[in-house]
Amino acid sequence: MSTSASGPEHEFVSKFLTLATLTEPKLPKSYTKPLKDVTNLGVPLPTLKYKYKQNRAKKLKLHQDQQGQDNAAVHLTLKKIQAPKFSIEHDFSPSDTILQIKQHLISEEKASHISEIKLLLKGKVLHDNLFLSDLKVTPANSTITVMIKPNPTISKEPEAEKSTNSPAPAPPQELTVPWDDIEALLKNNFENDQAAVRQVMERLQKGWSLAK
């Protein structure tokens, strides 16, 4: 099969190359458009809906290695040497992580949150994503030291409300306005001008009723 360009194709390529060499490029090869001038980010691509499980392959291998083995469990002693002290023995799977040990301690009500727990083996802090199979636990080093420090940033349970038996505050007493005394004072000031006294009294009584 011939790969040579036909007449029209050869003519197009020839003219294109000729035009491309007539003028120098206005922009250098290293030119990049400033971000402030970018108005279009191109065609949006759909989100890839896939959750990559980083530890899946390793867990699968551990599961295959455990098949046919009766004594695959990892026996651990979780010991807290600070008050209040405790010691818990439990069988875990080699594919379990340090995070799952912390969750077990929470289920045993030894802590309220994972952030409060720190596990150590031979003085080294164990990270949450570490597999028990990586610890190479033997009967001689099967004790994990537990340190629990309450986290002050975790909100505590709300305090109990005050006893309802405490006496309720007495309702405010309604004030009694001495209208007669006020009227007598007005008569004295207005020299018994009944029209002026009546007008002022009406305004005072109306304002008092609106202020209630």
Swiss-Prot record:
Keywords: Cytoplasm, Nucleus. Present with 6510 molecules/cell in log phase SD medium. SMART domains: UBQ. SUPFAM superfamilies: Ubiquitin-like (SSF54236). This is Ubiquitin-like protein MDY2. Required for efficient mating. Involved in the production of alpha-factor, the KAR9 and TUB1 location to the shmoo tip and nuclear migration into pheromone-induced shmoos. Residues 150-177 are annotated as: Disordered. Interacts with GET4. It is found in: Cytoplasm, Cytosol; Nucleus. It holds the Pfam family ubiquitin. One of its GO terms (molecular function) is protein-macromolecule adaptor activity. GO terms for biological process: cell morphogenesis involved in conjugation with cellular fusion; post-translational protein targeting to endoplasmic reticulum membrane; protein insertion into ER membrane.
